């Protein structure tokens, strides 16, 4: 009996591995197809069909990837872009030595935008490894020489088209511009990949991102300031936003109650039941807030863990 059990476990593991290999292989085919010069709709949907046929044997994660792929065709740049208010960028005239110190302290990303004059005139981006290489070799270099090119995308551009364009242009960053040519936001290659495989955490990521929150207890929630107010309303079962209000996010809600970005530790009464405390912010934007509910959460509306 013991030998039979081991054999069954081995067979089960082998089948699971085969499923995973199939999914990964099809994903690679799909991505390769997106970048192919001879791609046809039949090839694209043929791969999707093969994935769907095997969906009954997929794990939850694999099914999520398939669902993301099916939804990707209808998503646009505007759906996933980092808004202008959250963009971290550096002036073209910045000294390299000063820039290295600034990046160590303030910039949590490996790629940083460079602008000339204003953020509406982005000239490219630098990779942190290029900067430190120039400093280590004591090259008489300027910031301008380290700049890598970016591409331009409209908010309405399809994500599949942007992914293909990034590959053709061999760049990892796209600047999103509005109808007047102003900078509206940015999208990175990591943003696109995350739309397919889910969130990718690295050493610079915080615990929370723009799509989630953390319930601390029955009366406390920690949330990213970019979470939409409608989601919070759904969770706490309380109306916060009026039809004529011009904000969409929790951060926007807070800013309508104060004249400027509040300092960390500031507490703001939103209603008789809701108090919001700022727990992370920069001089220009809110990052993270703590939401206190005096009446507590409705346990029937949210699964507390």
UniProtKB/Swiss-Prot annotation:
PROSITE patterns: CBS. Signal peptide: none annotated. The keyword Repeat applies. Gene3D superfamilies: 3.30.465.10, CBS-domain. GO terms for biological process: killing of cells of another organism. It comes from the Bacteria. SMART domains: CorC_HlyC. Confers a hemolytic phenotype when expressed in the nonhemolytic mutant of Proteus mirabilis. This is Hemolysin C. PANTHER family: HEMOLYSIN-RELATED, MAGNESIUM AND COBALT EFFLUX PROTEIN CORC. Belongs to the UPF0053 family. Hemolysin C subfamily. Keywords: CBS domain, Cytolysis, Hemolysis, Repeat, Toxin, Virulence. GO terms for cellular component: plasma membrane. SUPFAM superfamilies: CBS-domain pair, FAD-binding/transporter-associated domain-like. One of its GO terms (molecular function) is flavin adenine dinucleotide binding. The gene is tlyC. It holds the Pfam family CorC_HlyC. Residues 81-142, 146-203 form the CBS domain.
């Amino acid at each position: 009996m013991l030998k039979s059990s081991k054999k069954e476990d081995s067979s089960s593991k082998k089948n699971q591995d085969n499923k995973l290999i199939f999914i990964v292989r099809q994903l690679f085919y799909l991505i390769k197809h997106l970048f192919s010069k001879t791609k046809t709709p039949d090839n694209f949907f043929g791969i999707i069909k093969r994935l769907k046929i095997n969906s009954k044997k997929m794990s939850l994660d694999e099914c999520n990837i398939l669902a993301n792929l099916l939804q990707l065709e209808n998503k646009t740049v505007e759906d996933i872009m980092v808004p202008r208010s959250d963009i971290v960028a550096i002036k073209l005239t910045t000294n390299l030595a000063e820039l290295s110190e600034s990046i160590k302290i303030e910039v949590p990303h490996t790629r940083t935008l460079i602008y000339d004059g204003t953020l509406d005139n982005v000239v490219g981006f630098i990779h942190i490894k290029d900067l430190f290489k120039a400093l280590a070799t004591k090259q008489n270099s300027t910031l301008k020489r380290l700049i890598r090119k970016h591409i331009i995308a409209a908010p309405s551009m399809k994500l599949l088209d942007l992914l293909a364009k990034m590959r053709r242009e061999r760049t990892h960053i796209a600047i999103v511009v509005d109808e007047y040519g102003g900078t509206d936001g940015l999208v990175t290659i990591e943003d696109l990949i995350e739309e397919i495989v889910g969130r990718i955490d690295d050493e610079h990521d915080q615990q929370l991102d723009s799509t989630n929150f953390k319930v601390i207890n029955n009366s406390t929630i920690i949330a990213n300031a970019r979470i939409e107010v409608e989601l919070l309303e759904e969770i706490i079962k309380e109306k916060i936003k009026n039809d004529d209000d011009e904000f969409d996010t929790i951060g926007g809600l807070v800013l309508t109650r104060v004249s400027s970005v509040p300092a960390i530790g500031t507490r703001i009464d939103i209603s008789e039941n809701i108090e919001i405390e700022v727990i992370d912010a920069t001089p220009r934007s809110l990052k993270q807030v703590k939401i206190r509910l005096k009446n507590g959460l409705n346990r029937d509306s949210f699964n507390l863990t």
